[in-house]
Amino acid sequence: MIIRNFPKQTNSLLPFELNPNKFPSYYGYPMYGYTGSYRNIEFPISQNGNFLQATSGNPPGRRVPEPIYSSGVQRSTRINYLPSSQSCAPFQSHADCDKSPNSKGGESYDWNYGWSSCCSGFCPSKRECAKPDPKECDIGNDILDRDPLLKIEWDVNAPNYRCTYDLHKINTSEQINLFVGKNGKNKSYDEIMTSFCEIPSHICPIDPGDGSLNDDKRGKEMEKCSRLISLDDEGTRCRAWAATQDNKTIDNIKEEYCLHNPNSPDCRCINRSSNSLYDEAKKNNPFPDGCWYKPCSTSVYLKTSDILSDEKHCPKEMCQVIYNVNQNNDVVIKDNTNNIKCDFTKFIPPTPGPNPGPTPGPNPGPIIPPINPLPLPNPTFLENKNVLITGIAVTGVAVLLFLLLMFKSKTT
C-alpha cells in the first residue's frame, strides 16, 4: 500500500510505503497501527494514512536531548520595517527599533541595518530595522516534512542570532549537511549525530544467527539494524563519526538503540540478559561474556566497549572449566551449546554400550584326534643293540676268513 495523500514535496521524498505493525517504537515513542517507510526509516502512521506526530515531552526511559543551537550573524533584511512611532515630519526624534527575544531570556533591539530618508532629507531620517529571520536557520524539513526550527532570537544583541531546533526533527543527511555548513562540527553536531545514529535502518548485513538451532534468520539480511552497522550511506556516516568519539558515547548510543528496538537482531549481545538460556549459562561462570557467549563474539552484532575488551583476554582453559562446573546441568551442556562458544563433545566421556558377551571364534570344523608319536627306543637298548651288531659282524668276518683258508688248502 502506498500513501498518496502526503503533502507534495520534492520527488525524492515519495513514495512512502505502509508496513502494518512492524516496529514497536519511533524514537522511543509508542507506535500504533502502521508505519511509513522512507529511505528505510520507519515513522508512525495511522491506518487512514495520516502521520502521527510525536507527543511533546519524553516517555519514561527516553533520554532527554540537549537543545540544538545554531548561531551566526544575520545578513537578511527580508523581515524589515520602519519604526511606527516616528513620522516623517520636522523636529521628530529618531525612534528606536522594536525589541525581540534574545538568548538570555530577555529582549534586545532589532537590527538597525540602515536609515531611511524623510522629506527628501529635510526631516530626521528613520531607522531601517530587521527582525530575526528564520531563513537564516533553515536546514530543510525532516523526513515527515516537519520544520525542525523551534525559534530564532537575537544572540544577546543584533545582528547576532541564535536558532534552536527540535532534535527529533533532524533526521536526514541533507539537514545535517546544511547544519554543518552553517556551524561546523560543534557540540550540537555531536548531539545531532547521536540521535541520527540511533535511528534504525533496513539496509543491513547478513545475520550470522545467534547459534539457536531454530534460528531461521541465519544467513539472511537482517530486517532491521542500527546505523552503526548498516550498509547505506547513513551507516557509513555514522561509523565515520563514531570513530571520533569516546567509548562511553558510542556505548550509550548502542544501549539506547537496543533499549527501544529490543527485537533488532544486532542487539542479541547487548540484550543478552533477556535470554533465559544466557542467564542459566551465566551462573557460576567466572569468564567475561565476550569470551564464551556466541552473540557477543560475533563481529556483526552491536557490542559495548567492555565486551570488545574482554575478547582480548580469554583464558585457554575456559571451555574445560565451564564444562566441569556444568557437567551435571543439561540446560547448559545440552540445550545451550549453540549459545556457548565451546565444543563440549571433546570433554564428554563416551557412553558405555550393552555388554556384548564372549566373542565367538571361527568354526573349528570336525575334531581330529591327535596322533600319538611312537615312543623313542630306550638309549640303553640302543647301546646293547650296537654291541650285538658289532659282535655278529666280527664273527661273520672270521667265518669268511676260515672258509677262504679251507678252500685254498684243498686246491693246493
From Swiss-Prot:
GO cellular component, one term: virion membrane
Record membrane topology: Single-pass membrane protein
Keyword set, alphabetical order: Glycoprotein, Membrane, Transmembrane, Transmembrane helix, Virion
Glycosylation sites noted in the Swiss-Prot or TrEMBL record: 171, 186, 247, 271
Keyword Glycoprotein: yes
Coiled-coil intervals: none
Residues passing through the membrane, by range: 387-407
Entry keyword DNA-binding: no
Taxonomic superkingdom: Viruses
Cell location: Virion membrane
Family (UniProt): Belongs to the IIV-6 337L family.
Name by which UniProt lists this protein: Putative membrane protein 337L
Organism: Invertebrate iridescent virus 6 (IIV-6)
